[in-house]
From Swiss-Prot:
A GO term, aspect molecular function: DNA binding
Protein name as it appears in the record: Probable transcriptional regulatory protein PSHAb0060
Originating species: Pseudoalteromonas translucida (strain TAC 125)
Organism lineage: Bacteria, Pseudomonadati, Pseudomonadota, Gammaproteobacteria, Alteromonadales
The family this protein is said to belong to: Belongs to the TACO1 family.
GO terms (BP aspect): regulation of DNA-templated transcription
Signal peptide span: none
Location (main, coarse): cytoplasm
The keyword Translocase is assigned to this record: no
Keywords: Cytoplasm, DNA-binding, Transcription, Transcription regulation
Length: 241
């Protein structure tokens, strides 16, 4: 593949309001995972992954526990997934994943950032085919052959293993996430995953260098992040200041 996985940490966690947004996002995802499966992370792998991810992002334990208890009690909202695709500032490709209890409200909220930044929301599938749905695991290391051997011994369907600047990035189909992570944990005792994601990785990137377009892009992403129903935003833009 010839490309290292870049972890883009959002600046949204820098304010109290943004932290509340992060907590709300995880609370909703954990609630849905627990409600759609077993409310026990030892049985429900999706729930376990979300809990581990939430803890890494410093989501308070009471937020996690409340979401699971709410799902176990059978009460609460009925959420459905919604995905919107299109072209953002600089003609970058964008995927917006949502959880919603009101699809009409959600499409209205998501469409607004596109409209306000002269971007274009498209039809389902218009850009998703230009992204790979990957499990991505990143950790310190410099020997890709040893990592690849450990994964192949566990019969993991590996797409790629990259090494760059003392960091190993493992790419596998998203369906291989738990298998790949378990294989690495068993092969390398005490492994610490700096990247632990199921995500959409763009097949090609687009560089944005114009200051006005960069400002418009920042506005676009901020407006999407402010939408209550938006859970994840994926794009292929690389900002060059």
């Amino acid at each position: 593949m010839g490309r290292a996985f870049e972890v883009r940490k959002s600046s949204m966690a820098k304010t109290a309001n943004a932290k509340t947004k992060v907590n709300s996002k995880y609370g909703k995802e954990i609630y849905v995972a627990a409600k759609n499966g077993e409310p026990d992370p030892d049985v429900n792998q999706t729930l376990r992954r979300l809990i581990e991810k939430a803890k890494k992002d410093q989501v308070p334990a009471h937020v996690i526990e409340k979401a699971i208890e709410k799902a176990a009690g059978g009460a609460g909202e009925d959420y459905s997934t919604a995905r919107y695709e299109g072209y953002g500032p600089g003609n970058c490709m964008v995927i917006v994943d949502c959880l919603t209890d009101n699809p009409n409200r959600t499409i209205k909220d998501v469409r607004l950032p596109f409209t306000k930044t002269d971007s274009k929301i498209g039809t389902p599938g218009c850009v998703a085919h230009m992204f790979d749905h990957f499990a991505v695991l990143g950790f310190s290391g410099d020997d890709d052959e040893v990592v690849l051997e450990a994964l192949m011994m566990a019969d993991v369907d590996v797409t790629d293993v990259e090494v760059e600047d003392g960091k190993v990035s493992v790419f596998a189909p998203h369906t291989e996430y738990f298998k790949a992570k378990t294989a690495l944990e068993e092969a390398f005792e005490g492994i610490n995953f700096e990247v632990d994601e199921i995500t959409f990785v763009p097949q090609v990137h687009i560089e944005i260098t114009d200051e006005e377009v960069i400002a418009n892009f920042d506005k676009f992403i901020t407006m999407l992040e402010d939408c209550d129903d938006v859970q994840n935003i994926y794009h292929n833009a690389i900002i060059k200041n």
